[in-house]
Amino acid sequence: MKTFRSMLISLLLVAITTTSGVVEGNYVVYDGEGDQVKPNVPYYISFMTSDYNMWICRKKWRSNDPNSCPQQPLMVTHPNMAAPTPVMFVLSNKSETVVRESAKLKIKFVDPRPCGESGFWRVVQRTSSEGEVVLNGSESTSDNASTFAIEQTNEYYKFTFGDGPDYLTTISLSNDYPIYRLLSKKFSGEMEIYFYKNLTMG
């Protein structure tokens, strides 16, 4: 009887410890295939699901030349197969093996390009109320302008930028159909996204 009681207490302690270790807003992020999103692994970013055929590409705004500079992250409608560019998530906490919601991270394009940018996403303020995502960021933990987080929406995910309720913004899309710039605006719409290890274009 004592042994059974000891085992029961041990199981309860394990359950309590496990439950308390999962903090709200700290859940694992999953990709479009249902796998855990991991740091330093290439992922393609789609607008909502791949069915929409809108993908993050690395291009110069309003240029059809793939080598034209400077380049930035753009959400492109119906890009050709060679255009979507995968990113990697670089975590501030190097001991983590998965990407979690709300975790501070850097977003970096995988392939180097001839424009001389670092490849790390960074928000530059264009006006007092609006910033734009460009590619001259850094991996430094002190570079807050290059620090993002992933949050869950109802069905998908979104990127957020900034710290605290007074400064937090959501990455949204410009109104420039069919190629959209990525904007950082408070109280704006959000760019709902999904992550894919493999490119599946509709």
Swiss-Prot record:
SUPFAM superfamilies: STI-like. CDD domains: beta-trefoil_STI_AtKTI6-like. Keywords: Disulfide bond, Glycoprotein, Protease inhibitor, Serine protease inhibitor, Signal. Disulfide bonds join 69-115. The keyword Glycoprotein applies. Residues 1-25 form the signal peptide. PANTHER family: KUNITZ TRYPSIN INHIBITOR 2 (PTHR33107), KUNITZ TRYPSIN INHIBITOR 6-RELATED (PTHR33107:SF35). Belongs to the protease inhibitor I3 (leguminous Kunitz-type inhibitor) family. This is Kunitz trypsin inhibitor 7. It comes from Arabidopsis thaliana (Mouse-ear cress).
